[in-house]
Amino acid sequence: MKMSERRVGSYRKSTLRCWDWCKEQRTRAYIIWRCLIFLLRWDDY
């Protein structure tokens, strides 16, 4: 019983780590996207 509990705990930890990485990637992509839009608009003027 304790083995399975420990396994679930480690799985949850790795999932949270993956989620943090995904959020970090999304934030970085969003910032790059905003910069690109800003530069494109700047070219239009």
UniProtKB/Swiss-Prot annotation:
Cysteine pairs bridged by disulfides in the record: none
Transmembrane stretches, start-end: 22-39
GO BP of this protein: negative regulation of cell population proliferation; shoot system development
Membrane topology of this protein: Single-pass membrane protein
Domain of life: Eukaryota
UniProt-annotated stretches for the region Required for DVL/RTFL small polypeptide activity: 13-44
Subcellular location: Cell membrane
A UniProt-annotated Pfam family: DVL
Keywords, alphabetical: Cell membrane, Developmental protein, Membrane, Transmembrane, Transmembrane helix
One GO location term (cellular component): plasma membrane
Task performed by this protein: Small polypeptide acting as a regulatory molecule which coordinates cellular responses required for differentiation, growth and development, probably by restricting polar cell proliferation in lateral organs and coordinating socket cell recruitment and differentiation at trichome sites.
Family: Belongs to the DVL/RTFL small polypeptides family.
Protein's recorded name: Small polypeptide DEVIL 23
Organism ancestry: Eukaryota, Viridiplantae, Streptophyta, Embryophyta, Tracheophyta
